[in-house]
Amino acid sequence: GGVDIVVSNAGAPWQGKIAELPERMLRESFDLNFFSHQSVAQNAIRVMRMQDIGGVLLFNVSKQAVNPGESFGAYGLPKAAALIWVRQYALENGRYGIRANAVNADRIRSGILTPQLISERSMARGVSEEDYMKGNLLGMEVMPQDVAKAFLHQALQTKTTADVTTVDGGNISASLR
């Protein structure tokens, strides 16, 4: 056994106006949405360096990292920090053959984007749930399999590091291009 690929995808969506948010809530969000990934990465890097065969760290940073949503700052702030943090891991560990990449996904039905949250976010935007889920340039709902394929692509690209792959059907506001 050993570690050659890590996909870190933990997260939860704390909500509230940032100026009114209890500090405890923001700290809880950072603990899960940033520091849990840091703990995973530190331990994976330690093992990967001992193995001396390289490896890849893959993280879900979310579109919130580059395009914040109303009353969603508690979730978006740690994701924005994670975006730069992934690149820092790439910078500091490339010499060991260890790559670090991220996926910037949006509106994926999951444990975070639950039916209740879809209802809340679509109401906040004044659109139907279907229109909310297809609210991108392609007019197509992005599925969990689409995100999984992006992670697989990043894992297989042995000469790619510090990459952020966007999987959102086309959201110009969240585009890194």
Residue spans for each PLM region:
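Alpha-helical segment proximal to the catalytic Tyr-Lys
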Residues: 46, 91-92
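C-terminal substrate-recognition "lid" of short-chain dehydrogenase/reductases
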Residues: 140-167, 172
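Catalytic Tyr-X3-Lys loop
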Residues: 12, 19-39, 58, 82
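Conserved Rossmann-fold SDR core element
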Residues: 2, 83, 93-113, 138, ...
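Active-site helix of classical SDR
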Residues: 41, 78
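A glycine/serine/threonine-rich, flexible loop-to-helix segment
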Residues: 95, 108-135, 177
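Active-site loop of short-chain dehydrogenase/reductase
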Residues: 2-3, 48-62, 95-98, 163
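Active-site loop-to-helix junction immediately N-terminal to the catalytic Tyr of the SDR YXXXK motif
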Residues: 21, 68-77, 88
